[in-house]
Design a protein with these regions (language model features):
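Phosphate-binding glycine-rich loops and their immediate beta-loop-alpha structural context
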Residues: 57, 64-91, 97-98, 110, ...
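Structured alpha-helical segments in the cores of large, soluble enzyme domains
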Residues: 69-80, 102-114, 158-166, 192-201
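Active-site-adjacent beta->alpha loops and helix N-cap segments on the catalytic face
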Residues: 36-46, 92-113, 131-134, 153-169
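Catalytic alpha/beta core domains of metabolic enzymes, predominantly
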Residues: 135-138, 144-209
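Active-site mouth loops of central-metabolism enzymes
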Residues: 53-71, 121-132, 179-190
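Short coil/turn connectors at secondary-structure junctions
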Residues: 50-54, 80, 118-121, 146, ...
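Hydrophobic faces of well-ordered beta-strands that scaffold small-molecule active sites
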Residues: 53-60, 85-87, 121-127, 149-151, ...
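N-terminal capping/small domains of soluble enzymes
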Residues: 1-79
């Protein structure tokens, strides 16, 4: 599909600009893909926020915090009543903050706050990696009581997104790192509705904007 709608069309030299604005997919084609497993309603159920807007934040600095420092920051955020916390897209499994250590420290803080207040913050842990790695990381998050995972779309590619979408038992937060390269020129590239439809079809429950 991507090769057909956004392949060599962009290489046609006589065109000074070409932009993909939207997609209308035949029902029979769209139904071949599962799409989001949870969507907004499922995400709200996991987050315990049935109606109002979710209040969220991103762990900063992007990289450099240890797993313990990340857990301490998450504890403060939970004490403040946050609904949604996500890893920065640069934070995956680096030496300063290994993925498994970060999950353990973060979920310790989340679960302790939930025991006190009855409110369990949703944390989107960045799984981005090779397919087998992402599956293992997803399972680790699930084992520690996590309620969300995250992938960098351009990093894992369409096949990676489809695979983790089939495997997941948790909502997937999809990060659009690199999106600017596809859309900054108003006469060239993709519109966000067209681009996001493909990733939703592949299994993304919500898109970072």
């Amino acid at each position: 599909l991507i090769t057909t709608i956004a392949g060599n069309l962009f290489e046609l030299q006589p065109l000074s600009g070409i932009r993909l604005l939207d997609l209308r997919l035949p029902t029979a084609f769209a139904e071949r893909y599962a799409g989001p497993k949870f969507g907004m309603q499922g995400t709200r159920a996991f987050a315990g926020v049935p109606e109002r807007p979710l209040i969220g934040t991103i762990i900063k600095p992007s990289v450099g915090l240890s797993a313990d420092a990340t857990g301490a920051l998450v504890a403060d955020l939970c004490a403040g009543g946050i609904d949604f916390i996500k890893d920065d897209e640069l934070q995956a499994d680096g030496p300063a903050c290994p993925f498994e250590d970060r999950v353990k420290s973060t979920m310790r803080a989340v679960n302790a706050a939930a025991d006190k207040t009855g409110k369990k913050a949703m944390v989107a842990f960045n799984l981005t990696g090779e397919i087998d790695e992402m599956r293992r990381r997803h399972d680790l998050v699930l084992d520690y009581g996590g309620t969300c995972v995250m992938v960098n779309l351009t990093g894992v590619g369409m096949s990676g997104m489809i695979d983790i979408g089939r495997h997941t038992e948790l909502p997937i937060h999809a990060h659009r790192a690199g999106w600017g390269a596809l859309t900054r020129d108003p006469l060239l590239g993709w519109s966000y509705p067209a681009w996001s439809k493909l990733w939703r079809l592949a299994g993304a429950d919500h898109m970072h904007v």
